[in-house]
Amino acid sequence: MERNDIQKISSETANIPVYKQSAEYAIEHDELPAYRESFRVNMACRDALESAIHESYHDYCLDTGKAAAQVAAQFGMERVAYVLANTVRAFDHDGRISRDNKAWAQTVPVCTDADEWGHERSRYFLVSQVNPGLVNLLVSRVREELAREKDAPAKRSSVLEKIQKNKAAVQAKAAEKKLPGQER
């Protein structure tokens, strides 16, 4: 599959859940279509990450917020983290990736998925067409966003919102109960 074909993935297909098992497992459990779709979207996410880094890098500065938000909006933070963790694991030897990011990548479950020749299939969705130092900056930002999502309490409705919703419900019921000729 060509990179241009992968970029044509619709937003509907980009919402496919991350399949975290190997192809062998998928075959054994009749889940091969789910594996293939997830793999295809992982490659599209890789391309989107590389494009976002290229587009967000100006004057020796990477706008990590813009790049992360752009790709997360299209693929979801779980897939972005999965693809980036896979990339960092593959570049474990590279000094341009921080120790903290390397340690984080080890906490993200990525299965071993070797093909019949012993090559790791996850290598197909490595973010490798940009400088690893820029990938490191983006990984740090994604980790911050993940921590923010995790620490943010679920949005609770305010008392005013509850009163307004209740008032609207009461008014709707009252309007239904009014009989013709009883209008004031």
Please provide the spans of the model-predicted regions.
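Gram-negative host-targeted secretion-system effectors, predominantly Type III and Type IV
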Residues: 1-183
